[in-house]
């Protein structure tokens, strides 16, 4: 349980971050944009289009060629200057296109149509572009480029997400660089593709000759069409809280509540920072820490406490955090504080012999990075748990487990891995695809490590969540669900499962085949048997929001395309503002592809 909890905490950003948006109602946030840049309401492209279709309005930043050819002056520069920053943006590329985002106008994260590439390099999507020096000699000019850890690119024409956590280079008072720029993290479509990458200087194509503490966001605009939306950021330039010398009183005995006893402490002393390491025993003690907390500016500050046992955090006598916790449980509490000096107190007790001693305190305000107020060794690192990977290298692999889908734990799930690198999770109870992904197969650590308490497993590649619903309905009727279905098992064809169901409402048997098709997964639904309702069956291709029919035989939903042949689809409005794409069956079989 403790390991699971810690992994969940790691997956959650520490502390809230305030997203400032770059408004995309006009181009006023940018410095002298070329005529190629416009603001539109929406852009559309199929996975084979090299150009966008646009609809007028606002909300999407679009670069399209409006002259004879592209020029370097088509790069787009923000008026905003930044140092340390966390940037989040959605982007879309047509087929074969190329762009990039330069932090401070100097350090490029590559945007490229890398869809389907088996091996990726520094110039693929999510890569940190190489540096360049002509003096190194012909063929050796490029150096220090960093490939993404894996190919996390979606198909062209789909919206993709990019998050960049960037630490600017540091300079002394004389302007001499004393620390390099660092890409602390780059996350492409939910996958970490770069982490703690230090760049010794500017990458190729920078618009400045020298490094500096600040610079603009630069979007490469001279390599082809590209679109952006939801441009958000947080800069980390504000000062944060600091802690002065720490005094402590140490008591021994059985303590059940964090109340300082009236008796004389066993020992007292002073420390440069918070730490448990002055406690000579493992249990049956109470520590009372006091320190002066300096607040630089009026603001709301979040304090995050960690301890093994019970404790209480007070500021100016007001209790912020209290309770019994394990050392890897982060407990946050926020309070507004005026600039100046404040009194901070922590009372910590541990009345049981098992488990390690630990004590930690972090502070965060909007506009500054998280800062630890404890000694580094006072908060233990978690036990390292090796990845337990299920591979599907030589033949299809079927693996049962529980799985989370849209926040709910599903218990009748089978994961199907394929040597092609195209995999999916399937809800046997519902007859539904829960998620599809590309890359490595399955992380079974939470199922097989130690006691395997959660019994869940997770995809290891670029994942697109599906609606998790049975893909058939009778005309003008609600979509079938598990109450209408009787699962009859599966049989294997070339090692891949064919799932079988009795569909009671339609008095038909349904066979569901899902196979890799190069671009994605091909799903074939077959109706078996005779029934008067057989001619009324419709395939439900997607249910959700932001669905679009791009052309006859091709639709999109957030995360993937849906492609089929034959009948014309209908886009329906259903309950709660959702949409549904339906296509009538023609005969006893219907096939469609999921492409991402």
Please place each PLM-identified region on the residue numbering.
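Carbohydrate-interacting regions of secretory-pathway proteins
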Residues: 19-262, 268-271, 281-290, 294, ...
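Surface-exposed beta-strand/loop patches in extracellular or lumenal glycoproteins
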Residues: 301, 528-547
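Bacterial Sec-dependent N-terminal signal peptides
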Residues: 1-20
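Short, well-ordered beta-strand segments enriched in hydrophobic/aromatic residues
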Residues: 87, 91, 512, 521-529
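Beta-strand-rich N-terminal accessory domains
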Residues: 20, 79, 372-511, 517-520, ...
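Solvent-exposed beta-strand/loop surfaces of large extracellular or lumenal domains
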Residues: 199-207, 274, 313-333, 548-583
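Acidic/polar, compositionally biased interaction segments
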Residues: 197, 237-387
């Amino acid at each position: 349980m403790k390991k699971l909890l810690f992994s969940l905490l790691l997956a959650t950003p520490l502390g809230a971050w305030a997203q400032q948006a770059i408004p995309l109602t006009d181009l006023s946030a940018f410095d002298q944009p070329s005529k190629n840049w416009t603001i539109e309401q929406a852009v559309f492209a199929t996975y084979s289009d090299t150009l966008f279709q646009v609809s007028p309005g606002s909300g999407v930043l679009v670069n399209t060629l409006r002259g004879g050819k592209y020029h370097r002056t088509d790069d787009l520069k923000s008026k905003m200057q930044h140092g340390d920053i966390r940037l989040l943006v959605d982007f879309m590329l047509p087929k074969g296109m190329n762009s990039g985002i330069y932090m401070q106008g100097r350090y490029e994260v590559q945007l490229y149509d890398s869809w389907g590439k088996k091996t990726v390099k520094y110039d693929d999507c999510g890569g940190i572009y190489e540096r360049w020096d002509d003096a190194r000699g012909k063929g050796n000019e490029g150096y220090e480029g960093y490939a993404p850890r894996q190919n996390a690119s979606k198909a062209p024409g789909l919206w993709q997400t990019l998050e960049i956590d960037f630490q600017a280079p540091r300079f002394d008072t004389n302007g001499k660089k004393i620390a390099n720029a660092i890409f602390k993290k780059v996350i492409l479509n939910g996958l970490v593709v770069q982490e703690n990458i230090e760049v010794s200087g500017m990458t190729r194509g920078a618009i400045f000759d020298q490094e500096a503490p600040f610079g603009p966001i630069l979007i490469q605009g001279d390599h082809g069409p590209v679109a952006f939306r939801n441009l958000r950021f947080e800069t980390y330039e504000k000062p944060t809280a600091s802690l002065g010398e720490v005094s402590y009183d140490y008591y021994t005995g059985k303590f059940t509540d964090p109340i300082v006893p009236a008796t004389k402490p066993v020992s007292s002393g002073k420390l440069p920072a918070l730490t448990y390491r002055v406690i000579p025993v493992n249990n049956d003690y109470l520590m009372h820490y006091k320190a002066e907390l300096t607040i630089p500016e009026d603001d709301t500050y979040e304090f995050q406490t960690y301890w093994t046992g019970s404790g209480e955090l007070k500021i100016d006598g007001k209790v912020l955090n209290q309770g019994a916790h394990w050392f890897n449980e982060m407990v946050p509490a926020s309070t507004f504080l005026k600039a100046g000096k404040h009194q901070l107190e922590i009372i910590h007790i541990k009345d049981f012999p098992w488990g390690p001693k630990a004590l930690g305190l972090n502070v965060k305000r909007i506009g500054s990075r998280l800062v630890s107020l404890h000694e580094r060794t006072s908060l233990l690192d978690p036990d390292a748990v090796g990845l337990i990977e299920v591979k599907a290298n030589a033949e299809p692999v079927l693996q049962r487990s529980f799985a989370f889908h849209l926040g709910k734990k599903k218990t009748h799930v089978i994961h199907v891995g394929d040597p092609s690198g195209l995999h999916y999770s399937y809800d046997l109870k519902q007859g539904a695809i829960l998620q599809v992904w590309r890359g490595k197969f399955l992380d079974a650590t939470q199922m097989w490590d130690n006691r395997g308490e959660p019994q869940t497993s997770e995809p290891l590649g670029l994942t697109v969540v599906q609606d998790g619903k049975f893909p058939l309905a009778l005309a003008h009727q609600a979509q079938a669900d598990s109450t209408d279905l009787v699962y009859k098992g599966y049989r294997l064809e070339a090692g891949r499962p064919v799932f079988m169901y009795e569909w009671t409402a339609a008095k038909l048997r349904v066979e569901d085949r899902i196979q890799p098709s190069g671009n994605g997964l091909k799903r074939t639904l077959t109706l078996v048997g005779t029934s008067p309702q057989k001619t009324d069956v419709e395939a439900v291709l997607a249910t959700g929001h932001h669905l679009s029919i791009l052309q006859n035989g091709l639709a999109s939903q957030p995360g993937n395309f849906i492609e089929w042949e034959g009948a014309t689809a209908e886009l329906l409005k259903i309950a709660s503002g959702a949409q549904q794409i339906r296509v009538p069956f023609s005969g006893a079989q219907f096939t469609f592809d999921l492409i991402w």
